[in-house]
Design a protein with these regions (language model features):
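Catalytic-core segments of thiol-dependent peptidases
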Residues: 86-109, 117-198, 208-209, 214-215, ...
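Short, solvent-exposed loop/turn elements at domain surfaces
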Residues: 55-59, 92-93, 378-383
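Acidic/histidine-rich, surface-exposed loop or edge segments in extracytoplasmic proteins
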Residues: 43-55, 105-114
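N-terminal carbohydrate-binding/catalytic regions of secreted carbohydrate-active enzymes
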Residues: 57-91
Length: 397
């Protein structure tokens, strides 16, 4: 309303000025109408699903592909493009597009790739993103990572294919699980960060286990406006794409409603599920509070903290609960400052009553984000100390 009144006054004064000067000079010619920018992409949004299905998730990929097509049925493919990069164990690697055919929605191949480069190689990720943006340019972009995930922990892979008789089945580290050439290969999150262009995606959605960790989120903070991820495991069925795609395939993606659909899908079945939506533009206020919490860092007891991992992963604890325990020994730390920052940063979060181990999740201590217990020495600590999050909040300790 204030803007309207301001412009109304401006127009009135301009009219009075022109009337007063009309006897001196002729009125200026009207400004020509702006012409459309021929460089403006015709599509409103292109969403890329980067799917590594060359592993035990292949049957889930087929199911999710059908869901994605169902989600695109009411969407104009001339204005909104859904692209899926997928790799199978057979070595069949291609970029597909959801298109309208005489038989209904289906995927058609728009580019094929060689299978000598693993899909967990950051060079392939960069190549596919560049292809997607060149082949289907749009005014905005979204990105789904579809595969296995395990937070920040590295594999240290050189992404070199090995003969089948040399394949070693490692733990699921970071992102991927490409078994195209016999070795189960993974992409570390610093590699992922180097492969992703800055300030390109409206959102990144990790449809993988454990990727809602502060280490992953902070490493990718400059890659998108928003992020959706799960601090715990997620069932291999993943997101209900028939509901999610229509909500995110529009100029203003409704990520909160899409996350709610995902949570409700599992919660109604009384299955474990956690999810969070983050506004990445608000993350530095969180890191400021955490830097203060760690200014007088000492190891803390973690046995009674809420834990989101199981088996040999992590352990990954609730981020806020861990930070407050560490910060209790720092005179610079203010819990209220952290709570305010988190309220702006995590714009939606939800958790089921129990986790995947059958233990209750305390909603009062559920932040939607996990964290590593800093300086609990493991074989991966050297790598952990190289991550942006550690450097940001530990003051070089």
């Amino acid at each position: 309303m204030k803007k309207f009144i301001f412009y109304t006054i401006q127009l009135f004064l301009a009219a009075c000025f022109m009337a007063a000067c009309s006897g001196d000079e002729p009125s200026p010619a009207p400004e020509p109408e702006p012409t459309p920018n021929p460089e403006q992409p015709g599509r409103k949004r292109t969403i890329l699903v980067y799917a590594i299905a060359s592993n035990n998730l292949v049957s889930d990929f087929y199911d999710d592909s059908e869901e994605m097509l169902d989600g695109m049925k009411q969407i104009d493919p001339e204005e909104y493009s859904l692209l899926v990069y997928r790799v199978f164990r057979s070595g069949d690697v291609a970029l597909l597009e959801a298109t309208s055919t005489d038989a209904g929605m289906d995927f058609t191949i728009i580019k094929e790739y060689d299978n000598q480069t693993l899909s967990t190689d950051p060079r392939r990720l960069t190549e596919v993103i560049e292809d997607a943006m060149e082949l289907r340019p749009a005014q905005s972009y979204g990105l789904f990572f579809w595969a296995h995930g395990s937070s920040w922990e590295p594999e240290y892979s050189e992404h070199t294919p090995l003969p089948l008789n040399q394949a070693q089945p490692p733990m699921l580290y970071a992102y991927g699980g490409d078994q195209t050439t016999g070795v189960s290969d993974w992409m570390d999150i610093d590699e992922m960060a180097s492969a992703l262009p800055d300030n390109t995606f409206d959102f990144i959605w990790f449809d993988n286990c454990f990727m809602s960790s502060i280490e992953v989120i902070y490493q990718l903070r400059n890659k998108a406006n928003f992020m959706v991820a799960y601090p715990t495991e997620i069932y291999s069925y993943g997101a209900p794409y028939e509901s999610v795609i229509p909500l995110v395939m529009k100029p203003d993606a409704d990520l909160i409603e899409a996350a709610k659909e995902t949570f409700n899908f599992y919660n109604f079945q009384r299955l474990a599920c956690t999810v969070a939506v983050m506004d990445l533009s608000k993350i530095e206020a969180v890191s400021d509070a955490c830097e203060k919490a760690n200014s007088n860092f000492t190891l803390v007891k973690t046995l009674d903290l809420q834990k989101y991992s199981r088996f040999s992963y992590g352990p990954y604890f609730d981020f806020v609960q861990l930070t407050k325990r560490i910060g209790a020994k720092s005179p610079d730390f203010d819990e209220t400052e952290l709570d305010r920052a988190m309220a702006d940063f995590v714009i939606y979060k939800a958790c089921s009553a129990k986790n995947f181990s059958g233990k209750e999740i305390d909603p009062e201590n559920y932040s939607g984000i996990s964290a590593h217990a800093y300086k609990v020495y493991t074989t991966h600590d050297e790598y952990y100390r190289s991550l942006d999050w550690y450097k940001r909040i530990m003051n070089g300790q």
